């Protein structure tokens, strides 16, 4: 259970509450091992796919190297249905994240919406899906640009963008 505690504070809490003596490094090792074990189950789980997906990419630094994390979320359930970690912001990682999000679908739902920021990789990836899979996967990206509601599209879709931006901030804060 994530309580927002550092590894050292988690170690101290286990000692205080349950009289379990374990080092912070051992907790980190257990977390890494658990992540490797559950990844296949998380990746293959048949998440419910709604008719509104929202996407965003953000960067994190791993040992001083900038790495990009692409996330695609089902807006209704707030489940992360697609993700990709890459060393660049190109179209390739965006396509891989979309491919993961669309896994299990034979066609897109009627009234499907894909909401993202103004980054050009999203429309290019959408064009690639339409080219490769035809009408069943032809969709347009609704781009919510900037931080203010300067047009009707931004006003209508801002909550979706804020949802994924909040996820990114939470992810970056806990990393």
Which residues does each PLM region occupy?
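Hydrophobic "anchor" residues on beta-strands that sit immediately upstream
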Residues: 52, 70, 113
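Short, positively charged, Gly/Tyr-enriched micro-motifs
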Residues: 1-53, 57-63, 77
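Short glycine-rich loop/turn motifs
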Residues: 65-71
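Helix-centered, glycine/charged polyanion-binding patches within enzymatic domains
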Residues: 118-175
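Short helix-terminating capping/connector loops at secondary-structure junctions
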Residues: 20, 47-48, 107-110, 133-140
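Active-site beta-loop-alpha junctions of metal-dependent nucleic acid enzymes
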Residues: 32-33, 83-107
């Amino acid at each position: 259970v994530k309580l927002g505690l550092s590894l050292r504070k988690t170690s101290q809490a286990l000692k205080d509450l349950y009289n379990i003596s374990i080092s912070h490094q051992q907790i980190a090792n257990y977390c890494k091992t658990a992540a490797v074990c559950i990844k296949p189950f998380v990746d293959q789980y048949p998440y419910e796919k709604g008719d509104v997906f929202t996407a965003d990419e953000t960067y994190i630094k791993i040992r001083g190297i900038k790495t990009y994390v692409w996330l695609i979320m089902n807006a209704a359930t707030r489940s992360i249905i697609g993700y990709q970690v890459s060393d660049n912001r190109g179209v390739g990682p965006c396509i891989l994240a979309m491919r993961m999000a669309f896994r299990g679908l034979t066609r897109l739902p009627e009234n499907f919406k894909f909401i993202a920021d103004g980054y050009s990789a999203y429309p290019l990836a959408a064009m690639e899906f339409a080219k490769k899979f035809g009408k069943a996967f032809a969709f347009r990206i609704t781009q919510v640009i900037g931080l203010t509601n300067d047009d009707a599209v931004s006003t209508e879709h801002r909550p979706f963008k804020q949802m994924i931006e909040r996820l990114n901030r939470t992810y970056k804060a806990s990393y």
